[in-house]
Every structure is written in C-alpha cells, then in structure tokens.
Amino acid sequence: MNTVKTLQDLRAAVARARSEGKRIALTPTMGNLHSGHAALVTKAAQRADFVVATIFVNPLQFGPNEDLATYPRTLAADQEKLLQAGCNLLFTPSVEEMYPHGMADQTLVSVPHLSQGLCGASRPGHFEGVATVVSKLFNMVQPDLAIFGEKDFQQLAVIRAMVRDLNMPIQIIGEPTVRADDGLALSSRNGYLSDDQRAAAPALYQAILQTADVISAGEQDFDALLASKKQQLEAAGFRIDYLEIRDATSLRPATADNREVVILAAAFLGKTRLIDNLHLTRS
C-alpha cells in the first residue's frame, strides 16, 4: 500500500491503475479507524481491483463547538488496518492541499431537503461540508464506485442525491453498520465514552429495535411510540437530539402508508453524541 499526500501524486497513482484497466473504488474516512471502516475497505476490494482510501479530518463539516481540534489522529494504526483490509492507495492530504485557496470563499455543494432536519438541524452546515469534500474527492479520484457505511444514513442519502443530481458516473454502495457484541454501532467517537457511559450506550440501539418490533406488529401511532421510547432513553441517561421514523428514501416523516421506513436516532451520553438507525420494510 502506498501513501500519498498531494493531489498530483494521487492522480498519478490512480492514472497508473486505470491505464492497467483496473476498476477503482474509493472509501473516504476521517481516520481513527475501527473494524467498521475495515469492513468498508474489504468490501471495496471485493468489488474493485484498486482501492483508494482517504483520511482527512474535514474542517468544513465541523461546527464551532464540535470536536475538530480533539478528533483522534491515529495515522500509523490506521495505515496498518487499511493494509490488512486490502487498501492499495492511501491519500492523506493536509487542509492546505484540500483547500489551497482557503475555506472562507470555498465553493460549497448543498443538497437541499435531505440535508435539513435530523443531524442537519443540530449540526448546521455539516452536510454542506460533507457534500463539498466528498465531491472534491470524487473529482480527484474519479472512482468507479464508492462505499459508505449505513450508520451515517442521512449522509449516505445526501451523497446518493448529490451523485444523481450532478450526473456523477459513480456507483454508491451502502454497507451495513458494524456493531460490537452488545449491539452498539462502532464509531470513532465511542472512545470518548467513560466506562459507565459505554455500558449504557447499547440502550440506544435496543430502543430502536423495540420501536421496529412495535411497528412490525402493526402500530400506526408513531408519535406516541416515539414519545414513550424517548422517555425510556432519558431514564437510561441519554439526552435526546432526535428519535424519528422517516421514509427510507425521501427522509420525510413516515406515515402509516410508508412501506420502507428508517428509524433514526441521535442522543448524547455526557458530551458524546451517538447516532444509529435501522431500516425496516413494513408488511
């Protein structure tokens, strides 16, 4: 696995692979990798001949009071994980390499509606930052396919819409969330949890599963169901950002008529914000 830091070196390496007729996959990350990221790279290696991973902690997608400065940087460990997972090329640009003209006047990519509400409501500007950096990486690498985790369900929906609306010839693949044995979705931010918070954290996914079971049993009063689950989570020590049942494609609030729905949650344990979701096909 080669590691490059400049756009020039990235494009040269990708051009060599493409000249050899290789199918190219991209897996963008912010580093501090766990086995969920490794699963994305492994899947990319199964679907393509040349896997490019990126590690870039993107300032544009962090709010003023978020964890940009403290987000863990673990490059050596990340390189080892990527190598074992089947990555061929790692791109680790600096902020100056990604935004050579500064960020104040950077052209931004905005995906309306899908970026609003849910995480977009509590993290204004976040998805604009995500869409902008992902579109830049897509232009830099020009992959045949790109793989993202379904844990960030709203992010995946935003990227799918961006690719569709901007006619990018890239196949977007969502991979199922990788979980710890107790059900907690793997996240780079789980390391912020204290021991007590880590023990409590699986209750978020348990509440989502219970919500899905009740919906599958025929419950149609979503508001009452969500209210009871919010109370349950608050009693377990969570501070709720949102708990919603949405149409799985449009992310608009689900009704009794929606067959494909997604249950989405974001909640704080202490200062750590956890997100999770579950896609459900109603009979």
Curated annotation (Swiss-Prot):
Example of a GO MF term: ATP binding
Reactions catalysed according to its record: (R)-pantoate + beta-alanine + ATP = (R)-pantothenate + AMP + diphosphate + H(+)
Location within or outside the cell: Cytoplasm
Active site per the UniProt annotation: H37 (proton donor)
Pfam families per record: Pantoate_ligase
InterPro entries: Pantoate_ligase (IPR003721), Pantoate_ligase_C (IPR042176), Rossmann-like_a/b/a_fold (IPR014729)
Residues binding beta-alanine, per UniProt: Q61
Keyword Flavoprotein: no
Pathway listed: Cofactor biosynthesis; (R)-pantothenate biosynthesis; (R)-pantothenate from (R)-pantoate and beta-alanine: step 1/1
Gene Ontology BP term (one): pantothenate biosynthetic process
GO CC list: cytosol
Claim: Metal-binding is one of the keywords in the record: no
EC number: 6.3.2.1
Domain of life, per lineage: Bacteria
Residues involved in ATP binding: 30-37, 149-152, 178, 186-189
UniProt keyword annotations, A-Z: ATP-binding, Cytoplasm, Ligase, Nucleotide-binding, Pantothenate biosynthesis
Record: residues binding (R)-pantoate: Q61, Q155
Broad class of enzyme this protein falls into: ligase
Main location: cytoplasm
UniProt record similarity statement: Belongs to the pantothenate synthetase family.
Role noted for this protein: Catalyzes the condensation of pantoate with beta-alanine in an ATP-dependent reaction via a pantoyl-adenylate intermediate.
Miscellaneous field: The reaction proceeds by a bi uni uni bi ping pong mechanism.
Assembly mode: Homodimer.
Name of the molecule in the record: Pantothenate synthetase
